A protein has these predicted regions:
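Conserved catalytic motifs of ABC-family nucleotide-binding domains
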Residues: 150
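Catalytic Walker B motif of ABC-type/P-loop ATPase nucleotide-binding domains
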Residues: 154-157
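Conserved ABC ATPase "signature" region
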Residues: 101, 105, 110-126
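Conserved ABC transporter NBD signature motif
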Residues: 61-69, 76-77
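Hydrophobic anchor residue at the start of the ABC signature
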Residues: 143
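Conserved ABC ATPase signature
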Residues: 129-133
Length: 196
């Protein structure tokens, strides 16, 4: 059985004045896929994701997410995408369980912190504060928060930047596990080996 398209981008353009940050990119992502946007810093990868996430306006082109038109259905699109926050997006002094409860309230989605942390192998850190985590643990926790609203798609922007080789492998095992549970994963990276 062929997977269906969950994201379709056609000739996407984003201009900032005379600077063209995204230059007519087109691609398709299929349900259950891990899809990577590869390119150097400044190539427009993050901007492309931010447009699809409805965080930025596009200058041209078409975007469809799960059949919804970005120009007409932004609220519906927002509900099916989980977005990874960078470490600076978390209150460092709160316990992981408190942060999950905070995000759970924002999404109006009841979640058991222990169950969610178990998915990312952090169940023993429930009472730890965010600032007490290692770099790899912080990345895994940020991925856990993308799963709170049970999204069809998650976006991970440069998820392994700054991680040591073992933490990178652990993160990739987690991403593959998330995909195996039916969630489509979109990543940006400037590492060729990750894109492969």
């Amino acid at each position: 059985m062929e997977n269906r398209k969950i994201i379709e981008v056609r000739n996407l353009v984003k201009n900032y004045g005379s600077f063209e940050a995204v230059k007519g990119i087109s691609f398709e992502v299929y349900e259950g896929e891990i899809f990577g946007l590869l390119g150097p810093n400044g190539a427009g990868k993050s901007t492309t994701l931010e447009i699809i996430e409805t965080l930025r306006e596009k200058s041209g082109g078409e975007v469809y997410v799960n059949g919804y038109d970005l120009d007409k259905d932004k609220d519906k699109i927002k509900r099916i995408i989980g977005v990874q926050l960078q470490a600076s997006g978390f209150y460092p002094g709160l316990k992981l369980s408190e942060l999950i409860e905070l995000f759970s309230g924002l999404y109006n989605e009841p979640v058991d912190p222990h169950t969610l942390l178990k998915l990312v192998k952090l169940e023993d850190k429930t009472k730890n504060k965010f600032k007490e985590l290692s770099g790899g643990q912080k990345q895994r926790f940020s991925i856990a928060t993308t799963l709170i609203n049970k999204p069809k798609i998650i976006f991970l922007d440069e998820p392994t930047t700054g991680l040591d080789p073992q933490a990178r492998r652990n993160l990739w095992d987690l991403v593959k596990d998330i995909r195996c549970k039916g969630t489509t994963v979109i990543i940006t990276t400037h590492y060729m080996d990750e894109a492969e």
